[in-house]
Structures are given as structure tokens and as C-alpha cells.
């Protein structure tokens, strides 16, 4: 920010990416249903790679924000397609769950380790170097996807017009409240309060207008039928709350370790590693247990218990807490997330029509993004109004309560065994 003389706009470097990604997940998930995943996967890799190069070449802060938004568009497209691709390739849920584990684990590890590795590269080589790493990975991924990923052409959307009005309303319905929440956690909240509330109201208004529009069009961008079942509503509500817990921990635990307990940024980053490193282990255990469950929703209950226990034990941390204890507690939270995150997507795919599987999967990811924005905003407001220490403690209590609610919701979900799906 100092290098580009734009400290006042610094927060929007991350916010711009997040908003662009969250807004587009649902739209690109549905477009994948209509036109196939492979073109969108290739386009997402190209956009992310080009956006990274342009961001690294930015000469001022507005340019950097604009190119981060471009990256976010590619990121949203990537999330929407990669989480749905296993459903196209493996109609059998027993085989699909293994690949869902790999996808979810890769995403979780990248989300946790990416910022830490980026910080190390920035410290060693400068901030521009952090952006020049991604294009190389994007080129390799583009080649592998182009050569080996099959082109599966949907047949149910042939000749039907794209729902442009629904796409616009959906963009406002998702993006406006998220932008409002981001403004609420800005430093000068009072200066933005009116605009933030206006954005939230605009988002709800667009959502209300979206419903009758989607009921009328032949091929809706957001098919309302994916929310007709009780289970789909409960799964997305649980995903919303879990997203809040996950990002409160990822976003604010480093602040607790550094500002309250006095750890160095490097030490705090290393202590956070178990949270994301153990998620794949939980996902692999989930993949082994899931086919054996007559009531697979019990794994959601197990995940919420582990996650809630980890949040509760996090409140025991002090400046004198031994490293092994911090690792055990954060590993417990990571294990819980490993049981929750892949199952939300898999269960939504299991109860949705094949023609809607992209929209259903994308909805889960969007709800997680909404939950993360809401959770981090509420804790951010608590920190701003009280203090860092007290605000973080309130945030952890909030996480425990959310985990209890997720556990209760999970008991109300009734899923059939994957062997029968």
C-alpha cells in the first residue's frame, strides 16, 4: 500500500477479490449446468493468470484493486466449476466422495497456507513477486485441464435463452449486502453507515424481485427448485453458519496470537498451520466413514461437535500456553471442518437433479461466503467497539454458539446412504 501510495484503499485489495468471487459463483455454477464445465474451467485459469500478471505490474492502488477484481471473477468461476466437476465425472456418490475430499482439501489448504506463503515471498522478494507465482501454476493447470478433462456437453439447455435479468438481480442480491458488510467493518464505520445499510436493503430488494422473475423464465439462472426440499434449506443454513465460524477463526486467530499474546507474525502463522493442514485428514476420514453410514448426517453432527469443542478450547489460550496445546486445539477445529465442508456440497448434489447440480453446488459455496462476511463483520464491529481482546473472546463465544446450532440443524437433516443414491 505504501509502495503505491494508497493506504486508504488497502482494504479493498482483498475486498475487491472477495466480492467479485462471491458474486459470480452462483452465476458461473449455473452456466456450467447449461454449457458445460470445461470451457469455464479453462477461462477461469486464463483470467486468474492474466489478472495476477496485471496485478503484479500495477502502478497505483486503483489499478491493483481493478486487477484483483478481475482475479476474483476468475476465482469465482473456478470455485463454481471445480466443486461441481466430480458430479459430472462420477455419478456414483461412493466414487465421487473421494474426489470431493481432494477438491475440498486442496481448497482448504490453499486458503490457509496461501496468505502465509504469500507473506513470506513478499518479505523476501517484494509484493510484486507474490503475484508472479500464480501465472505459472495457472499455465500448468490450463494445459492439464485442456488435455485430460473431458468435454461433457449438457443436452437439457440446447437452444434456450440466457436469463440476463435474473443474472443482474442475482448479482445485486448477493453483492450489495456483502459490500455493505465490508463497509461496516471499515475503520470509519460511521462515515459509511448510511451507504452500508442502503446496500443491504438493495440486496434484499433485488432478492425479492428475483423470485418472481425466476419462476417465469424457461431456463432460470437460479432455479428455485433446488431449495424446495427441507434438507436443501437446512444444508445451506448450516453451510452459512459454518462459513462464519471458519473465517472468524482464519481471519482473527492470527490477530489473537499476535496482538494479544505477543507472538511474531511468523510464529503465529506456523501455529495456524494445523487448522488447515488437518482439514484433509478429517475429509479423508469422512470419505472412509460415509459409505458405511445408514444415517450419513451423523457425520455433520460429529463435525460440528469437533469444531465447537475446538472453538471452546481456544478460549483457554494464554500467552503462556504450550505450543503442543495450541496445535492440539487447532487440529481439533480443522478435523471438524474436514467432516463438514465436503459433505455440504456432496449432500446438495445427492438431493438435486443432475441438470441443477452446478447451481446447487455453487449455492453452498455462496452461502459459505455470505457466512464468512457476516461473521467477520460482526466480530470486527465488536473489536472496534470494545477492544481486541474482549472482541475476540466474544467472537469465540459466538463461534461456539454457531457450532451448537449447526449440530442441531444436522440432527434435523435426513439423508439416505450413498450406496442407495
Task: Show which residues each predicted segment covers.
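Transmembrane-helix bundle of Major Facilitator Superfamily
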Residues: 1-148, 315, 381-385, 396
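Short helix-kink/termination motifs in transmembrane helices of multi-pass secondary transporters
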Residues: 8-11, 15-16, 20-23, 37, ...
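12-transmembrane solute porter fold
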Residues: 14-16, 51, 125, 192-195, ...
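Hydrophobic alpha-helix/TM-entry signal in multi-pass membrane transporters
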Residues: 41, 48, 64, 100, ...
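Cytoplasmic-side transmembrane-helix entry/capping segments in multi-pass membrane proteins
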Residues: 43, 96-106, 159-168, 227-228, ...
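Hydrophobic alpha-helical segments of secondary membrane carriers
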Residues: 90, 100-106, 165, 238, ...
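Hydrophobic transmembrane-helix bundles of small-molecule transporters
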Residues: 123-238, 264, 270-271, 399-400
Amino acid at each position: 500500500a505504501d509502495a503505491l501510495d494508497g493506504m486508504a484503499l488497502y482494504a479493498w485489495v482483498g475486498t475487491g477479490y472477495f466480492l467479485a468471487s462471491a458474486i459470480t459463483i452462483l452465476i458461473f455454477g449455473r452456466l456450467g449446468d447449461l454449457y458445460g464445465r470445461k470451457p469455464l474451467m479453462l477461462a477461469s485459469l486464463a483470467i486468474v493468470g492474466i489478472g495476477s500478471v496485471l496485478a503484479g505490474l500495477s502502478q497505483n492502488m486503483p489499478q491493483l484493486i481493478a486487477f484483483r477484481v478481475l482475479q476474483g471473477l476468475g476465482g469465482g468461476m473456478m470455485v463454481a466449476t471445480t466443486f461441481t466437476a466430480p458430479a459430472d465425472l462420477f455419478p456414483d456418490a461412493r466414487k465421487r466422495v473421494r474426489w470431493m475430499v481432494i477438491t475440498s482439501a486442496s481448497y482448504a489448504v490453499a486458503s490457509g497456507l496461501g496468505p502465509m506463503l504469500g507473506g513470506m515471498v513478499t518479505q523476501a522478494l517484494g509484493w510484486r513477486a507474490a503475484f508472479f507465482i500464480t501465472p505459472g501454476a495457472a499455465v500448468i493447470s490450463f494445459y492439464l485441464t485442456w488435455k485430460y478433462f473431458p468435454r461433457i456437453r449438457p443436452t437439457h439447455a440446447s437452444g434456450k435463452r440466457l436469463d440476463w435479468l435474473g443474472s443482474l438481480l442475482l448479482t445485486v442480491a448477493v453483492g450489495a449486502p456483502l459490500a455493505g458488510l465490508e463497509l461496516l467493518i471499515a475503520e470509519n464505520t460511521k462515515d459509511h453507515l448510511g451507504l452500508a445499510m442502503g446496500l443491504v436493503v438493495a440486496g434484499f430488494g433485488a432478492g425479492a424481485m428475483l423470485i418472481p422473475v425466476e419462476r417465469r423464465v424457461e431456463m432460470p439462472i437460479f432455479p428455485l427448485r433446488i431449495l424446495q426440499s427441507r434438507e436443501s434449506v437446512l444444508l445451506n443454513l448450516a453451510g452459512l453458519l459454518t462459513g462464519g465460524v471458519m473465517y472468524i477463526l482464519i481471519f482473527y486467530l492470527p490477530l489473537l496470537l499476535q496482538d494479544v499474546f505477543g507472538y511474531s507474525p511468523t510464529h503465529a502463522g506456523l501455529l495456524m498451520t494445523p487448522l488447515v493442514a488437518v482439514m484433509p485428514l478429517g475429509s479423508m476420514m469422512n470419505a472412509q466413514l460415509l459409505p458405511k453410514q445408514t444415517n450419513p448426517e451423523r457425520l455433520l453432527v460429529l463435525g460440528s461437535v469437533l469444531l465447537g469443542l475446538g472453538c471452546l478450547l481456544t478460549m483457554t489460550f494464554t500467552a503462556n500456553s504450550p505450543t503442543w496445546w495450541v496445535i492440539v486445539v487447532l487440529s481439533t477445529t480443522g478435523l471438524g471442518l474436514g467432516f463438514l465442508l465436503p459433505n455440504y456440497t456432496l449432500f446438495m448434489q445427492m438431493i438435486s437433479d443432475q441438470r441443477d447440480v452446478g447451481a446447487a453446488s455453487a449455492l453452498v459455496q455462496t452461502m459459505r461466503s455470505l457466512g464468512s462476511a457476516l461473521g467477520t463483520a460482526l466480530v470486527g464491529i465488536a473489536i472496534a467497539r470494545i477492544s481486541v481482546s474482549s472482541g475476540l473472546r466474544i467472537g469465540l463465544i459466538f463461534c461456539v454458539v454457531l457450532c451448537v446450532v449447526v449440530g442441531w440443524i444436522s440432527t434435523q437433516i435426513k439423508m439416505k446412504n450413498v450406496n442407495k443414491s
